[in-house]
């Protein structure tokens, strides 16, 4: 029997990474109307979980971490000779589950050949292979359960200090020490990358390449 990893506690973080508005009792139809009414180019991100709508406005710490994690992933994909389709914060809607999300980043890596060169149809295509969420402040959405229901194989969460890696096993997320997508890369490399990138982002990428090529 696989036991799901507990939801990490994000309330203890002193930094303010996001502003959030939570609305309860929102129907799926109302959620879609709100999506349609909002401009395509916006900083806010929506997550809908069966009646609960959370609107997140990322602040600097959030965006900084999210962008650097994306640089980290793309560098690893290139170094390992993999392929990638980046979905960014594309709206991922599953009407049958009454769930929708705009994660910080989502990627097709293992399944990139299935979706390359076209728009993804979530009604027929598999979910992204890897989803990344930066949650520095408390979120009312149980993200682990949420993305496990969407059957996302791998889920990364970063709270501004701690990076957690979850792998889907028997329908629930289990916390693991190494990424199934990048098994050769220890957690320490991301922490070192983020710390170095605070001073210089290009140098952080160069250091990652040097480490890989040793």
How should each PLM-predicted stretch be described?
Residues 1-214:
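Gly/Pro/Ser/Thr-rich low-complexity, intrinsically disordered segments predominantly at protein N-termini
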